[in-house]
Amino acid sequence: MKIIADTNTFLAVALYEPEREKIIRLTLGHDLVAPDILPFEIGNALSAMLKRKRIQPEELLPVWDVTQQIPVDLRSVNIREALKTASKFNIYAYDAYFIECAISLYCPLITLDQRMIEVARSMGVKIMEVI
């Protein structure tokens, strides 16, 4: 089965967050898919964590490297449709890209973002429950 994986799940695994083991259990043996903006979003999140001192400079590249070792199929998304979703539900376009990916591929979504879960569910997307 293909599973659309949100950026925060990659970071939770790489940073050994409490949700790490459950994410791995839920996705083991399945194919992860994400919008092709995933590497950029991971890079942005890591630089924000560095800026907020959540990670140290010497951790930045090793954490990046771990996220890049997780196999994922990067897909383009219909940005126009994603923007409609972002506008309708007042969410960031980046979040809407993951929802649009799940809708267009008829795949479940795994995320730690509660608002994204609410919006995706309201649009008929199946959620892989982590929390």
Predicted segments, located by residue:
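Short, well-structured N-terminal submotif of metal-dependent ribonuclease cores
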Residues: 1-37, 49-61, 123
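Acidic, PIN/NYN-like endoribonuclease modules and their adjacent C-terminal/linker elements
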Residues: 2, 35, 99-131
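A cross-family signal for key residues in well-ordered alpha-helices
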Residues: 11-12, 24, 44, 83, ...
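Contiguous, function-dense segments enriched for cysteine-driven chemistry
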Residues: 11-19, 68, 74-75, 110-117, ...
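Structured helix-beta-strand junction loops
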Residues: 29-30, 66-70, 105, 123
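Active-site-proximal, substrate-binding regions of enzyme catalytic domains
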Residues: 43-79
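Active-site neighborhoods of divalent-metal-dependent phosphate/nucleic-acid chemistry enzymes
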Residues: 69-115
